[in-house]
A protein has these predicted regions:
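RNA-interacting cores
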Residues: 1-218
């Protein structure tokens, strides 16, 4: 299940680095709950509809912006919806004006709606970030998907996820989150699996840290 949010923006400038503010909105709308600290079977996209203005170090939204929130558990989104109804204000003057439910897709090729983060644990609790062109990227992307399937109680052991850079724009990015520079991929992805598997990825996202704004797909 996925909610598409239509946001009012009257000439608003949103700083380039605003992902933490988006996470803050999600947590505000959730309120006290049992989801914090659990495996993040939800995802949310970047704000769209704006224009980058380098001189102002931000993104200009003339009239409106949109983004989506997806989750494998409908109760999660019901709580989000209640939170929005109680307090639709976001940040930088952005206000949610309308929420609609998006239809589920029936396909295997998807496109990024936020950068995809892949992390592999190294020695001394350090992590290596993998990018879409790395030789082990698809293996790690698939393992991550399998963990999400296990957490959601879906048995599809043959399911795979892979980057498909030839299907559209593919590039590397460096995303700052709380001062940490994350090497991430912006690339189409292909998911081979059952309809339930594809739906889980559509809602919960791919890769690591979907709960803080990475790995949403459309």
């Amino acid at each position: 299940m996925r909610l598409l949010l239509d946001v009012q923006a009257n000439g608003t400038i949103v700083p380039f680095v605003h992902q933490q503010k988006m996470v803050g909105c999600i947590h505000k709308w959730l309120g006290p709950n049992t989801w914090h600290g659990q495996s993040s079977l939800f995802s949310f996209s970047r704000l769209s509809g704006g224009k980058a203005v380098k001189d102002l170090e931000g993104i200009l939204f003339d009239h409106r912006a949109t983004f989506f929130i997806g989750a494998s558990n409908p109760d999660f989104l019901r709580q989000i919806l209640r939170g929005i109804q109680q307090d639709p204000e976001m940040f930088c003057g952005l206000i949610v004006r309308e929420v609609v439910i998006e239809e589920d897709p029936k396909r295997e090729l998807f496109y990024p709606a936020s950068p995809i983060l892949l992390k592999v644990k190294q020695k001394e609790n350090r992590y290596k970030h993998l990018l879409y062109q790395d030789s082990k990227a698809n293996e790690v992307l698939t393992l991550n998907l399998q963990k999400k399937l296990l957490a959601a109680g879906i048995d599809d052991r043959d399911a795979t996820a892979e980057f498909a850079p030839c299907e559209g724009v593919a590039k590397e990015m460096l995303v700052d989150y709380k001062g940490v520079k994350n090497k991430v991929s912006w690339s189409p992805v292909r998911i081979i699996g059952s309809p339930e598997t594809k739906l889980l990825a559509w809602n919960a996202g791919l890769g690591n840290s979907t709960g803080i704004g990475f790995g949403a797909i459309k």
